[in-house]
Amino acid sequence: MSAQARAKRPWRGVLALDAAIDRRVTQPRKRGITMVIDKGIGPAALADIDAVAAPYIDHWKLAFGTSALMPPQVLADKLAFLRERGVLTYPGGTLLEAAVVQQHCRVFMQRAEELGFTAVEISDGTIDLPRDRRRRIIDCAREAGLVVITEVGKKDPQCQPEAAELAEQALDDLKWGSSFVIVEARESGRGIGIYDKTGELRSSFLEEIANLLGDKIDQLIWEAPQKEQQAALVARFGANVSLGNVAVNEVLALEALRAGLRFETLAAVADREKASGQWDPDMPEPDEGPATRESARQELRHD
């Protein structure tokens, strides 16, 4: 984070807040990705979100088949707006699965590029894809000039693969040219993948995937639509864990959680600081002195 960027923060100079925010890697990010799920907002709403949360948005997924139903000019305007800001855009994987069933994979990739998408999500959450077919679809997307994002896992709660299967598929996808791998959880985050039917994290399942991925773990994007899930993953992997299926209006809330500026993560930070002796609740705040206070006032006057 540059000094110039830090100086523009509303709460600059409050060292604890600066330190909390500085824990995050900055754009363009290769880890600590926030993937937003868009179920159909318009250009005005997109501009509003950009105005308040642009530094915290990395990927933008137009959910399931919504991009096929949107007015063409609206879709074009949204994709152009996001592309100008360096945000990776892709349609939901279900749309590609529908094209694969009709043997239209290559046409789909060409059309995605023409429409202005910069990436594509390749999944088999609904259909079954043989390994070789999946690899060839990845090749097809790359030949079309698209960044490849794959997804592992099934959407049906009754057909959930084991952790080792998910990890093996993720490693194969990365070897075949995928830039990131999303771990399926759907929009509900219940009974799918790393979550049980109540939405709680299946810790042993998660740890098995993490252990098998090893140093590739930063290329996983964990779908985490619920606040409690986001908090649990931040607690496990740190502020720079990659999270997906984040609601459009929850981007800033997630960033506050990452920075330890919400109850769910601040409590852990406070406990850690207290245990290490860095913070003593009984110790009064030191007097900064009039010179320091006057310097702060001068800084505010010259903004």
Curated annotation (Swiss-Prot):
- Disulphide bonds in the chain: none
Record's catalysed reaction(s): (2R)-O-phospho-3-sulfolactate = phosphoenolpyruvate + sulfite + H(+)
What residue spans carry the Basic and acidic residues bias annotation? 290-303
Sequence segments annotated as region (Disordered)? 273-303
Q: Name one GO biological process term.
A: coenzyme M biosynthetic process
Output the Gene Ontology terms for molecular function: phosphosulfolactate synthase activity
Print the keywords alphabetically: Coenzyme M biosynthesis, Lyase, Plasmid
Going by the entry's taxonomy, the superkingdom of the source organism is recorded as Bacteria
- Give the record's pathway: Cofactor biosynthesis; coenzyme M biosynthesis; sulfoacetaldehyde from phosphoenolpyruvate and sulfite: step 1/4
EC number of the protein: 4.4.1.19
Record-stated family = Belongs to the phosphosulfolactate synthase family.
What else does the entry mention about this protein?
In Xanthobacter strain Py2 coenzyme M plays a role in epoxide carboxylation by serving as the nucleophile for epoxide ring opening and the carrier of the C3 unit that is ultimately carboxylated to acetoacetate.
Described by its record, this protein's role is as follows: Catalyzes the addition of sulfite to phosphoenolpyruvate (PEP) to yield (2R)-phospho-3-sulfolactate (PSL).
> Know the name of this protein?
Phosphosulfolactate synthase
- The source organism is Xanthobacter autotrophicus (strain ATCC BAA-1158 / Py2)
